[in-house]
Amino acid sequence: DAVILREHIHDVFRKAARETNLEEKRRLLTFHIVGAGFTGVEMAGELAEYVPILCDRYEVDRKDVSIYNVDILERTVPFLPEKLSNKVEKRLKKMGVTLMLSTNVSKMGKGFIEIQSKDEDKTVHQKTGTVIWAAGIESSNITQKAAEILPSENRGRIKVDDYLRSLEHKDVFVIGDNMYYIPEGEKTPVPQMVENCEQSAAVAAKNIAYAITNSGEMIKYKPSFHGVMVSIGGRYGVARVGLPNLMFNLPSFLAMLSKHFINIFYFVQVLGWNKIFSYVKHEFLTIRNCRSFVGGHFSNRNPSFLLVPLRIWLGAVWTYVNTLDTKS
């Protein structure tokens, strides 16, 4: 899907470069990203960061490109604290993304999208070249079929009890993105993210073993998440990490650093150390367009950070020489 989307984006820029009608050119270069959750804002950030490069390559005026991020909710990434959501919104606006929050998509088709603000009854018809749907996660096909029989919520997520069993069929266990479970004392269901998948899988495996062998005892699912991280392009991110009862926000540099640490941690488990070296080379040493939270300073094509000790030494020598000249 990512490759198809990338080729589509290049294709609309190629068409726009040849288009002589300004109105049609701007339609081709209009992007609507529906959904301002984790996927939506990350997509908007990546696209906004990629647009200047595409404009240079295809000789397109940046002013003709429009990126809209649409969501029915009042703020971006509502799973984050409001302070971090505000940072995300500020960064997206700085990158040229137009936020359309509290806005519902009522209809869309080839070359257009119709949106309606919750504060107004008027429906706005906008021309567009691309609509990217990032408004929520759909359950897998097999889960969707199961949801026709089993109690479910939110796009086919199956309701489960404390032991991750279906509410009506105790021999059916559901985990990860496919389950709908609200922990005790919480008001919202567990998020559809990696930590929830891993932790629920471990609990379900033990409970299935108990159901088969009838030895030991069932384990209640008590999720303990260590935080979330959102990257807005390759140079900026926000994160909230810590322990369940002690969470804190990280500044952008540390947030991006934690992102790479997490990626490396999972690569070691899945692909081994060889992949780590490839990842480090790609993300820190071969950096194109300064697309990294360390800028281009670590690039092997321009390793300017290696010059820092030399510059410090040279500055110290000049200071020492000037001091001697002053004394003489």
Segments the model singles out, each with a brief description of its role:
Residues 49-162:
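A Rossmann-like FAD-binding core segment of flavoenzymes
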Residues 196, 200-294:
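C-terminal, flexible cofactor-proximal segment of oxidoreductases
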Residues 1-39, 46-53:
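Glycine-rich dinucleotide-binding loop and its adjacent helix/turn
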Residues 44, 137-139, 235:
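Short glycine-rich anion-binding loops that position phosphate/pyrophosphate groups of nucleotides
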Residues 282-328:
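Alpha-helical membrane-anchoring segments
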Residues 1-21, 112, 125-199:
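FAD-site-proximal beta/loop scaffold in flavoenzymes
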Residues 30, 64-66, 171:
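Residues at the starts of beta-strands that form the adenosine-phosphate
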